[in-house]
Amino acid sequence: MKTIDLVVPCYNEEAGLEHFVLETNKVINSLPEYSFRYILVNDGSKDRTYLIMKKLAKTFNNIKYISFSRNFGKEAAMYAGLRHTTADYVVVMDADLQHPPQLFPQMIQAVEHEGYDCCATKRAEREGESKFRGIFSKLFFKLSNRLTDVKMPYGAMDFRMMSRQMVDSILELSEVQRFSKGIFSWVGFNTKWIAYKTVDRQLGQTTWKFSSLFKYAIEGITSFSVAPLRFTAVMGFIIFVISLIYIIITLIQTLFLGITTPGYVTTLCAILFMGGITEMSIGILGEYIGKIYMEAKDRPIYITKFSNFEDEDNEEKDDKEING
């Protein structure tokens, strides 16, 4: 019997976590030829998410959980879940049912019978999404595909099923500053994309804000590209050429045509323009230096406070001691 692990990052999912498990179980029960296991990762939730995880783990014997000591972010939660997987196939999904488990049969068909290493999803249309957020999302994917070496279709989501080989390859990339969408693409492997229409979450409230999305976009581009650094170098060269041409024109007008140019106007414009370019360049450079600084510390990606994987390990140790 083939096994499938479901990696589910959770942050303040008190309202909908139990409902998510019950709805997902309906799909799992319709696929008796596969053995499913949940790996729920509590990313430092401020509500009762962890207590609900413990309750569910006592009710269903196929539920494992990991609870962080604080909020480390969704990327860390996904990485923690992937590290604890052992199954033939691994699914990464959210707990808000915006990633419908009803797609499992299609995913299984792709990775097991059609020869794909990964079956990923992309957003076809989303009800209730603001136009501003939609425009920002499209701009991000266009910039990312143009500036980085990884290519992602518009609307690409983390929700996907992957082969064991692909998961093991992803785990070899242990950087602290993670951007999983880019990592999924960077490792390669044959991927089938499924487009589906997403809907608003049924229970609870989204924890993603525009500031989080903007930070996520910056992280994605700077994790896989040095194009912003090259951009500042090109801008510097262009400004140098323009300045040189302007100086030559000014000298010709002054020496040969007798035209005098007011100095304060050009000086003020030049100072403001160069000041803006300098600040932008320092900011871009600082972003990359900051990433190097965080990686050089070599801190753990996450810290586990509670986990019932430890109970499993203790049982294995007891069995070994009993069997000699």
Spans of model-derived segments:
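Short conserved micro-motifs on helix faces and helix-strand junctions that flank
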Residues: P9, F68-R70, R160, A233, ...
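Hydrophobic helical membrane-anchoring modules
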Residues: F179-G324
